[in-house]
């Protein structure tokens, strides 16, 4: 640690600062950027107006970012606490950090990671996730060796060690992500366990989990903060899957007067859940809530919500469930919360929170509790009479979903829920430029919260800068694309930019492995064919448009060439293939590619339909994995 940070600081204080730093550093990259500061103030529920938060963050960056690289390192963080301690700004900052609750340092002596951040984990989360997983996998014969787990011990951290539970949870969140035939379930040697963990991590990445800083060895060792972080992402993706208008048209009942369907579609799942809870609270005559933390601590809003959504027995075959409101008047908060959870239990929804989690206002677990309520009992009716353009609700294409998952897996902030709406201020695109080694001058970038007046102008300036970077340092082909197109959310032109980002990212990985040799389509095709023929395989490909790719045989053979003997050819169909055969081959190929360690984002359908862009990424990822053999 350098001079500037060592002025009179005790070991205890240093440990506390490390823990605080880890709480703010959301993507665990060892630095705090202004997005993470915004998230911190948002989560801390501090009663500050937007402009005040902007001022505080600007001042923190000004005083704290001493080497002016646009982010705060751990040493700079210590400096803020040491030197700027007395200022109001630093006091507010400390207060915000202290409000992120529920932290339990590991046995008092936390492990320090290479970045010097302290890792702590939340007992409450462990307890909640264990109960959720026990219920989800109670009838799965492949998990009998670990389920049920005891929520009061460290069972969970041991249970994830062979990768099976993780693979199963991924499939529950996004069905069919992993081909069950690719999960090793017997004779679990260290090598076979490593493969399962590769499969789990690469599949988690493909559904949009941020796993950049998690390795298979971390999961095998059951590192609590990493296990809980990954599980929360997987569980959340499953909980949020249907909180989306194209998958759940009844959500249109939440439209407010004068609001268009397009505006409603831009809301994140969290915002929709809040809107849903308030819709029912309004109908019950109770006041609105603004969050799932401070505003639900007394359980009173929950009582009303349960009472509204409980089935009234009016539909055929639907038993009536009565919510007993007597606990509402209980004077003790914890007892009131317990009484409320007993009512939730009648609906089969006593999940994720204990009475203490409700009373402490744990934001993550309360969000999960409400999402589960929504999934079981939405209690919404699709509006029939209104003038609604239902054609807008087409849902995202496979390609859009793949791009979105790829971005989220790289840990962009904010999380991308809607490809076009969430890129309209270009912040995510600018972060992706950094991931492909195109330097971004963050002092030129406008950041949220944007001022009420002129917000769109600020976003447009970012979009113009994003297009400028694409044309010059990145040398993308952006003919006819302007910042306005990104700002308007023009699908075709936004996709053109995003595809070039993903392509460059994929090729960079290859160039890093090949000591900087340029990679392009021809080089990949030649490598694929050479590798296949050297392994004595009869398949080959002409290009990424080659129709024979639809059988997936070239992909399967290439995987077997890279890791000889890993493919079970009894499971692979050849000859005259039906659509089903092709799909089964593709599903097996994608899962096996992930199992041998290739981070494949494409979907089986991309191979069956021979989508050249996605086919290119599959072969490029496999080439990357093949080059690591040397």
UniProtKB/Swiss-Prot annotation:
SMART domains: CH, EFh
Keywords carried by this UniProt record: Actin-binding, Calcium, Cytoplasm, Metal-binding, Phosphoprotein, Repeat
Chain segments carrying region Actin-binding 1: 109-382
Residues reported to bind Ca(2+) 2: 65, 67, 69, 71, 76
Residue span, EF-hand domain: 12-47, 52-87
InterPro entries (UniProt xref): Actinin_actin-bd_CS, CH_dom, CH_dom_sf, EF-hand-dom_pair, EF_Hand_1_Ca_BS, EF_hand_dom, Fimbrin/Plastin
Oligomer status and interactors: Monomer.
Name this protein carries in UniProt: Plastin-3
Species name: Cricetulus griseus (Chinese hamster)
